[in-house]
Amino acid sequence: MASSSSDLTLDDHHHLTAVAAASGQATQKLQEFLSRLEEERLKIDAFKRELPLCMQLLNHAMEAYRQQLEAYQMGSQHSAAAAAAARAPLVLEEFIPVKNIGIDVVAADKAAAAGGNSVSSEKASWMVSAQLWNAPASASAADTAAKGPQTPKEHSEHHPLDTSPKLITALDGGGGGGGAFLPFSKDNAMGDGSAAAAAALPELALAPAEKAADAITIAAGEVDKKPYAHDNGVVARSREAQNGGKPPSTPSDGQAVPPPPQPHRKARRCWSPELHRRFVNALQILGGAQVATPKQIRELMKVDGLTNDEVKSHLQKYRLHTRRPMPSPAPPTAATPQLVVLGGIWVPPEYATQAAGPAIYGAHPATQPHYTAAVAAQEYYHHHHHHLQHHPAAAALVHHRAVAPPPPLPPQQQLAPPYSAKSSASARLGSPDSDGRGSGGGGGAAASGAGRDMSESIEEEGEGEEREDDDDDDEMAATNNAHAVDGDDDNDEINTTTTTSAGAINY
């Protein structure tokens, strides 16, 4: 907005005529802009719910152009009055033309200063009214110095769209060349720097310089009255106390603000085993963790520096720990079930106890000695067969002992069941001859009673015994033949033994 001092004079009639013509052209352009914006608004009126921001921007732009159009119309009237006054005799009076911030008006002023021949370039953008392009601060300062002081009314007429104090600070810090898109700068507390900036740019303020200075003083007083006004993230009162009562100083440009020292924090309480033991003893005295209070526990512990909060925190942790279910010990593993031999089968002990009662048939283990004795007898005679062939006297003595008749049975035992006869027969086992003939003599009775009372296992045992007895008979027959051939001296004893054996079998 650079302008010469000739703008303030009244002796240039051509200049006034050019300004009037330029304002007429600007009025026509503004009307065209308004008509175009109205057409655009009608186009998107059906979509105003989907495009609320577009409608808002169009309405604001149209309102701004209407205000400028009114200002131009008022300006044209003032220009006509000024032209009429110029034709009258020269009167020395101060005349300040009404100017606006629009870019088109500035271009018209420049064209009029250059001679009025050039026409300003069109910048058909409704955003001009929002001051997205700002003039340099130096040109504004020069123009302000040329114009001199202004009254609040004139200032409001010259600057209908003034900016806020925050934008003033941003423009001053950025040099005024960044436009609307300026980097963010934090608002510091009111100080000498902001006061100087406000004094350097009085035309950008909302109030005159005197009122602005008073407002700055009042704002500084309010900052002093606030005891906890934050300054750069730190409480001002605490910083003032750290500086010894001095107010916080504003750092110079280019220097980093040193971070404030952190306040000393109290060390965390470390509960040693001894301290915890005292804690547990106090709980036992007071009646448990659910009844005791932190104050009572602290008084009983008698520890210097221990606070109720620390005891309370430890008590809560202790309650949580004791409330947690303790891991139960692992149950003892069940002993390996013992197995008992019952009838040749490995069975659990409970079945053995049930089988301990009276059984219909005899238990199998009772027959085990019979097999062992039979095998032992067979092996014995097999090993000594050759010895008996060469010693007839010893053979006759052994045979006589083996076939000796057993004592007679009592009458009540003569009609015993078949298995008792079987056990008596097994008791008489002494020699192969007696076994064979005894088995042969009682074979009929065993066979007749097997179908009625004997089980399958006892029948199988009887069959095995019969086979063993047959083998023993063959061996004893061979032995008797050998004795008969060896000598005539022993024939009498052999005959006697044979007769005795026959009597035992018949018996």
Curated annotation (Swiss-Prot):
GO terms for molecular function: DNA binding; DNA-binding transcription factor activity. Its main location: nucleus. InterPro entries: Homeodomain-like_sf, HRS1-like, Myb_dom, Myb_dom_plants, SANT/Myb. It is found in: Nucleus. The keyword DNA-binding applies. It comes from the Eukaryota. Residues 152-161 have a biased composition (Basic and acidic residues). Keywords: DNA-binding, Nucleus, Transcription, Transcription regulation. Residues 294-319 bind DNA. SUPFAM superfamilies: Homeodomain-like. Interacts with ACA5. Probable transcription factor that may play a role in regulatory networks controlling development and metabolism. This is Transcription factor NIGTH1. The lineage of its organism: Eukaryota, Viridiplantae, Streptophyta, Embryophyta, Tracheophyta.
